């Protein structure tokens, strides 16, 4: 158990060191920033929190199943248009909604999110919401209708 934890921390450190060595240029293995764009603002995926994206990329690696991003960054206008919550973490670039194809993928995605320290997770029938908004309750799960 301790060895597994140490290996996990070493992998996290590797991602951080790569980011530093590359002059803080974010390099994602599994995502393009455009996947996180608000539909009404091309290029807005660049407003996503970089540390969150690194964690999400690492979670994708651990899960070994595709993470199709349904929603990443949202402008306030787009958030209102789709009926998003006022104060949504998507507006801050701290949240993503990941499509999931079934129970097995859902379990793998949630497990991998927890492994990288993403502990705010909402579970819907066809998607998983995850965020790292420190201004909200931590270590929480919720269900969507």
Give the ranges of each region predicted by the language model.
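Extended, low-complexity, intrinsically disordered C-terminal regulatory tails
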Residues: 57-83
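Catalytic cores and adjacent binding grooves of peptidoglycan-active enzymes
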Residues: 87, 91-92, 100-145
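The substrate-binding groove and active-site-proximal loops of carbohydrate-active enzymes
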Residues: 43-46, 95-99
